[in-house]
């Protein structure tokens, strides 16, 4: 047996040193790799946490309310349903109206119950895909509200309130692939067809963007832009003129009428009630479904005629000359909860919502009025007329408890040539009948001029002056 006296002699120094270096390198590699992985995890976690806190989103609460007729709704299950009342909707909902129906899309902030972010009126013969609606997950995020609509064909009215703490951005894609963006509080009117895309802006910021993103046309306040989808040409003209200053019904714009001429100088709705017997109707500014509106209410089992009226004098009661306009149209936003009479009463003059325009006809004849009414209840066993003696059109039936955006035809075309308005003196909205419960949010009057359009838009220049 041979015993090595010096163990180190069995392991040369060079071999020991090489192995030690390799071990050290492996150890350092593991340590540095772990540190790098730790750093990556920290950065990734930080970025993920930042995204979650600042950039992640949740869906808005979306409500579909049918104001008239029935509306088609196709959800993610691809089964088309027919909706008459109200129901909650989600992303990727396809909505369509026919020639007689209208719907309203209302978007609410789920973190602040009742806070209305935007409303979109879907007018007749319109289809769209609600692609997305979102808000930031947490309040500390600086993101705004986002609503995206795809494949629009038809007409919309978009309202973004002015009392929100976050920016609202509505993005709309036409069936031709062009884009429209709406940002900031305001009122926007859109009309999209295969031959023409129209955007009208009152109060907000808007833009038309080509499908390829190559061109962008900004549309300022009180402007209207028309795009030819085939050529991409965009033509900008003045929007129809809003003839009523501050048309909304708010605490600042509604006063109780005292019958004095001094009130005519105020840009306000002068409201009052009359009745043939107790009780007298009442009016109050309220918050209804997230919007400010005037409620006109008469209950108590009333069996006599009564009215609650709000009148707006134009130009301090002297009237506004409209002879320079080619079109004249009303846009009224209202809701009827209920009324006791069938239709509009035995003479067709007691509707729970009626609109009256007082005007001086051409030639300076005696002042006259144009009327139009709306109702929700009709008893087929009671043969009340659907038109009043002074009306040019039948009254309209709308759905109970639903906001409805009425847009009139051109008033000039509804009246005979010798009765065409020369000056508008008053615009009046009122509830009439026995019992009634109605709301008015706004009443607008627009005057438009038919400007000739350039060649890319064809020969029909009338579109430039149509109602918003």
Indicate where each model-derived feature is located.
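Extracellular carbohydrate recognition and processing domains
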Residues: 364-419
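Extracellular carbohydrate recognition
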Residues: 398-405, 415-454
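Extra-cytoplasmic beta-strand recognition segments
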Residues: 249, 312-363, 408-413, 443
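Short carbohydrate-recognition loop motifs
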Residues: 277-307
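Flexible, surface-exposed loop/linker segments and immediately adjacent secondary-structure boundaries
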Residues: 13-18, 22-99, 106-230
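Beta-strand-rich interaction surfaces with strong enrichment in secreted/lumenal proteins
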Residues: 85-87, 93, 314-322, 383-400
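Extracellular carbohydrate-recognition regions
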Residues: 217, 227-280, 443, 449-461
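N-terminal intrinsically disordered, acidic low-complexity segments at the extreme N-terminus
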Residues: 1-17
